């Protein structure tokens, strides 16, 4: 299950279910496809995952996600932590996570990942993380909600026998969505 600072859809229902039923909860994407690092803030490198897989990255690149990441970045800097280390430490120290799937492309990243296991976030930092989350609850869903509402309206048009209205609205919607992704 995807689990990171900007995608915590599983708090608390699924987590409680897993605890009660002694089911492991394996988290992946603790750095939100690199969004919870500083590498996608400027000077994006050629052949980076952002360039290679832009459609996948879209779930993390909405305005709400970016705003939340900036707040987490400011928090990490004010506590003399790398954003990646704070993000990883947050996930690693969650008692319900059995493990978290990580990845690195160089030794510096691997070193930061290993070091994050030894970083214990104090209660003040945890409270600030939770406060940021309360202001930006699951910002990655911004686009998913738009798609859900689109398909809900589309189904109604189709069932009402208004297929051509559906087609015209679809073209408008996807053009707008493409503009949002640029």
Can you annotate each of these PLM segments?
Residues 1-131, 156, 165, 172-174:
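Beta/alpha (TIM)-barrel catalytic core signal, keyed to glycine-rich beta->alpha loops juxtaposed to Asp/Glu
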Residues 121, 133-137, 178:
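C-terminal alpha-helix/helix-terminus motif
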Residues 143-182:
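Membrane-proximal basic amphipathic "stem/tether" segments
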